[in-house]
Amino acid sequence: MITISNLKKQFGETIACDIQALEIKDGEILGLVGNNGAGKTTLFRMLLDLLKPDAGTVTLDGINPAESEAWKDKTGAYIDDSFLIEFLTPEEYFAFLGKISGLSQEEVDNRLKHFERFASGEIFGQKKLIRNLSAGNKQKVGIIAALFYKPQLVILDEPFNFLDPSSQNILKHVLTDYNKETGATILISSHNLQHTIDISTRITLLEKGVVIKDLSNVEGSAKTELENYFETEV
C-alpha cells in the first residue's frame, strides 16, 4: 500500500503538490488526470525519491523511500528518457539490465518475448542507439524496462505519449494483463482520458497539486463525472 500524508511541494510561489491524505491499495490501477501543472509528475518524482517534499510523508508498504532503498527491488518506473542509457542499443541496454540483476541472456530474451507485439519490430534488430530512436520507440524501451524486472509497483508518467494509435491500444492490454497476472499496483498519469478510463480501476483528479476527485472506476463508471468536470467528450 502507498500512503501519502500532508505531502507538500512548492516551487517559488507555485504550489505543485498539496495532498492531505491519499492511500493506494495493492493491486489497483490508479490513473492520475488533471490539466497541465496539476502536479502529477511532481507526485511521481516524490514517490520515487527523485524530488524531496517540503513537508509530509510518502510510504511504500511502510517504507519511506527517502530513508531506505528496500522499495527499489519491487518498483519499476518510467518518467522520461533520462531514465534510459541512450548510448547503448536496446539490445545492449536490456543485456545490461539483465546482468546487474543476475539474469542470463536466455532469461533476458525470454522476458523480452512478452513484449514482442508492443515492440512491433521497431526496437530490436535495428542497429540503432537508443538516442537515435524515434520518441515513440524510446517510449516503448522505457516502458518495457519498467516492467522488465516484474515489479510489484509500476509508475508510468504519460505512457501513451508519442505512441501511434495501434501501440497505444496494445499498451492498454500490456498493462491490464500485467496487473491481472501479477497483482501489481500500477500508477499512470495521462492526458488521454479515454485510455485512462479504459484501464484504471480508480481515477484521481488533481488540480494545482490538490486532489479534487477520487473516483472508483468500475467498467468506466467515472466517465460521466470526468466529462462534466472537463466539459469535453472522452
Please give the residue ranges for each predicted region.
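Catalytic Walker B motif of ABC-type/P-loop ATPase nucleotide-binding domains
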Residues: 154-158
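H-loop/switch region of ABC-family ATPase nucleotide-binding domains
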Residues: 189-191
